[in-house]
Design a protein with these regions (language model features):
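FAD-binding core/adjacent interface of flavoenzyme oxidoreductases
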Residues: 1-5, 73-141, 211, 239-243, ...
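Rossmann-like nucleotide/phosphate-binding core characteristic of flavoprotein oxidoreductases
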Residues: 1-4, 198-201, 261, 277-289
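Beta1-alpha1 glycine-rich phosphate/pyrophosphate-binding loop at the start
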Residues: 3-57, 142-143, 148, 154-174
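Residue-level detector of alpha-helix initiation sites
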Residues: 11-12, 112, 151-152, 259-260
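Internal hydrophobic alpha-helix adjacent to the cofactor/substrate pocket in enzyme cavities
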Residues: 18, 22-26, 166-172, 267-289
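A Rossmann-like FAD-binding core segment of flavoenzymes
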Residues: 60, 66-86, 91-92, 98-101, ...
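FAD-site-proximal beta/loop scaffold in flavoenzymes
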Residues: 122-138, 218-266, 274, 281
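Active-site glycine-rich loop that binds ribose-phosphate moieties when present
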Residues: 126-133, 143-156, 176-177, 191
Length: 289
């Protein structure tokens, strides 16, 4: 018998979706490969009632709560493909096995594409960061370097300036007069010299902390192979969804970072709940048609 829903991704969005569905007494399988996007950060911040708690602890507590319901199932494995079949969807695993679900919720997140800069990888999530809302309070108060990559660099630097002495590494010729004036009002320093490497003994960093709005790429490619419509954002390509987290493909829902240009734990859990409610309603409609 197929699951009522298969959730690919067992972090905040996926667990939130699963919790709603198992509370509706629906059979749910959560698939997770154990590699959450925030695994490089020591703590999660800005999460109501969990501010400063390690992200893996938040996820572990959520997983235990979901697992307490008898209709919940988990599989720690890598999903490699998802296809539509007559009764719903078939999900393939790396070992060649398959499982089936009447609805599919994609919550596997995205991967940060780091700048090609020596020293970034070993500092990522500690002193080389991507989200001022997540880490700005802890690293603020001193100089904060911002890599001037992409069209969103100027806006990003103006936001980062709230937490410290922002230094934007960018060719001044790329700035319009309005942008230059706005950065000056925000007291952002323009540094034309390109950053060649990060120095210091990792994960520490000599001088300024580094913030970069690293763009993202979809993990797994499930949405595109299923024919879901995608949309381009300054942060990268994401799955296009409506207000109910429904993709362009019937029966396929997307929640969390893979379906929004900027994410955090709170937004991911909200998306997961919304997707679960929509998936539940679609099951009811099918069963009563």
């Amino acid at each position: 018998m197929p699951h009522d829903a298969v959730v690919i991704g067992g972090s905040y969005a996926g667990l939130s979706a699963a919790l709603q569905l198992v509370r509706a007494r629906r059979r749910v399988l959560v698939i997770d490969d154990g590699r959450p996007r925030n695994r490089f950060a020591a703590r999660a911040h800005g999460v109501l009632s969990n501010d400063g708690r390690p992200g893996f602890e938040i996820a572990a507590a959520a997983r235990a709560q979901v697992a307490a319901y008898p209709t919940a199932a988990f599989r720690m494995a890598e999903a490699v493909d998802a296809t539509r079949i007559d009764d719903g969807f078939s999900v393939a695993f790396a070992d060649g096995s398959r499982t089936m679900g009447r609805r599919l919720i994609l919550a596997h997140g995205v991967e940060d594409v780091l700048p090609d800069l020596p020293g970034v990888k070993e500092r990522w999530g500690r002193t080389a960061l991507h989200c001022p809302w997540c880490h700005g309070y802890e690293v603020g108060g001193g100089p904060i370097g911002v890599l001037g990559r992409g069209d969103h660099a100027v806006q990003y630097a103006s936001v980062v300036a709230e937490w410290g002495q922002a230094v934007l590494f960018i060719d001044p010729a790329r700035l319009s007069e309005d942008e230059a004036r706005m950065l000056a009002r925000r007291r952002v320093t323009i540094e034309p010299t390109p950053v060649e490497r990060l120095e210091g003994e990792a994960p520490t960093l000599t001088g300024a902390r580094l913030v970069d709005g690293a763009h993202v790429r979809q993990s797994g490619g499930f949405a595109e192979r299923l024919g879901c419509e995608m949309t381009d954002t300054p942060m990268g390509r994401i799955v296009k969804v409506d207000a109910q987290q429904q993709t362009s493909q019937p029966g396929v829902f997307a929640a969390g970072d893979l379906a929004r240009p900027a994410g955090n734990i709170t937004l991911a859990t909200t998306d997961g709940m919304t997707a679960a409610h929509a998936a539940f309603r679609s099951l009811i409609e099918e069963e009563t048609a």
